[in-house]
Amino acid sequence: MKYVIVSGGVISGVGKGIVSSSIGALLKSRGHVVTHFKIDPYLNYNAGRMHPYEHGEVYVLDDGHECDMDFGNYERFNGIKLSGANSIPGGRLLHDIVKCEREGSFLGKTLQINPHIIDEVIRRIRAVADTPVESFGGGQAAVPDVVVVELGGTVGEYESSIYTEALAKFQYVVGKANCAFVSVDYIVELETGEQKTKGIQMGCRNFRRFGLNYDIVICRGRREPNMETRRKISTSCWVKEENVLGLPNLESVYLAPMFLEKHGIVEALNRILGLDDKGMDRRMLDIFSMVGRRHRDGVRIGIVGKYAPEFDSYTSLVNALKFSGAHIGVNVEIVWINSESYSVCDFERCDGVVIPGGFGARGISGKIEAIRHARENGVPLLGICLGYQLSVIEMCRNILGMSDAFSEEFQPSGKNLVVRFISDENGVVDKRLRVGGYGVELRDGLVKKLYGGVETVRERHRHRFEVAQEKVRGLLQHGVRFVGFSSGGKKINVFEVESHPFFVGVQFHPEFNARPDRPHPLITGLVSASYERSK
């Protein structure tokens, strides 16, 4: 078993997740079975309650774990399905260890960082290494031969020191010949063009304090490091000059694997780990090139949300739209519409609209107005999760005349709460989050046709509220069709409007199941309908 361990020592948020995903994709293209593991030093139990401005979107795995957004990159780049076992948030690790102590599992011993926390980190990494990896498209799961481990944050932080120490012991346990350490760090470039490497040098020095040394240094920045910069990093950081690589800002993150491949990262890893290529399959890399390519025609899709786009709040949705655009052969231009400060002109310049998921009352009036505009003007629309619920509310208000139609999330009581807390199969209200992959039974209609005519699909959910079926039956007389239900048919999951080019709402999150080689059919349907409208 071989391990590629990715970390950084200057600043966070420079692309460790993209580099980790790219390394996985490149090794997979050479015939290896790859899995991923991430250590998040923060003390939160998971990413589920973290604000998008703090940490980007919450990515939902099929088993229901709410993870860091990097897990979306791991799954998309490598076409695999991961589980909560592939993740260590610091808070959950401490919680699990204390829980075991309370249950008597440590037989009265004094709990310490070393050995108890450090050994548990090592145990979890090795457990993932022994767990078969499931491909997204199905097929037989295979035991990995390479694990790409990402350490979040930066080396030298208080929170990271425990985990860096664990990685040092991990190298001792599995052997240096089985570990390759990769640094992803930022080069500061002055206006004069001079590249400053002191931050990278200090990051590598901090790493050596734990008895570790980087094998590869990847320099992020506006430009690649010049020869003098490479030489300085090599000398100061004790890394071979040919293993000092650059990764400048690219037009698309999906071009990163090919850029790193061109500059020799696979050959470097092969030398360090003693790996041999087991074959060559470039199909996924070719698809990455297609996703990153510019097309002649374009389509403008509006995303109506309350979170600012620069905080990665809708990363999976943006990726899903790009995949569908590449599949059709059009550029998808995202039009960001703030649901709290908008004008009708914002809606009018869009060929199609997405109302994404979210929580809380802030900005919902703008979303409802966008839904009304799209429905009345024939603009293709896809409502996701909260967007689905608000679409039902808008139709109940403006088609059925239920002016007080609302959601229990925003108004605890009322006559026409058409969206309410989830209830179980016995009708008992259950306020817990419904999260993870669930089956959806499809009825005849456009949505089923887009899915290829299958009877049942599995989609990822994350919600506490559902549409009250008995409150919305009147919509059936106005061309609204409910065409997707939870297993057993008791909960509405999907609607479509017959007299509209594309007006679809889904309770689940299709963006979490979109892949470069398998764009999601509903999102492709939206992009296709929007492109037709733009002609």
From Swiss-Prot:
State the Gene3D superfamilies in the record: 3.40.50.880, P-loop containing nucleotide triphosphate hydrolases
Q: Which reaction does it catalyse?
A: UTP + L-glutamine + ATP + H2O = CTP + L-glutamate + ADP + phosphate + 2 H(+)
Q: GO terms for biological process?
A: 'de novo' CTP biosynthetic process; pyrimidine nucleobase biosynthetic process
Please list every transmembrane segment annotated in the UniProt record, as residue ranges: none
Spell out the catalytic residues: C385 (for gatase activity), H509 (for gatase activity), E511 (for gatase activity)
Its Gene Ontology molecular function terms?
A: ATP binding; CTP synthase activity; identical protein binding
Identify the pathway.
Pyrimidine metabolism; CTP biosynthesis via de novo pathway; CTP from UDP: step 2/2
Q: Which Pfam families match?
A: CTP_synth_N (PF06418), GATase (PF00117)
PROSITE patterns registered for this protein in UniProt = GATASE_TYPE_1
Enzyme Commission (EC) number: 6.3.4.2
Cited InterPro entries: Class_I_gatase-like, CTP_synthase, CTP_synthase_N, GATASE, GATase1_CTP_Synthase, P-loop_NTPase
- Residues in domain Glutamine amidotransferase type-1? 300-535
Question: What is the protein name given in its UniProt record?
Answer: CTP synthase
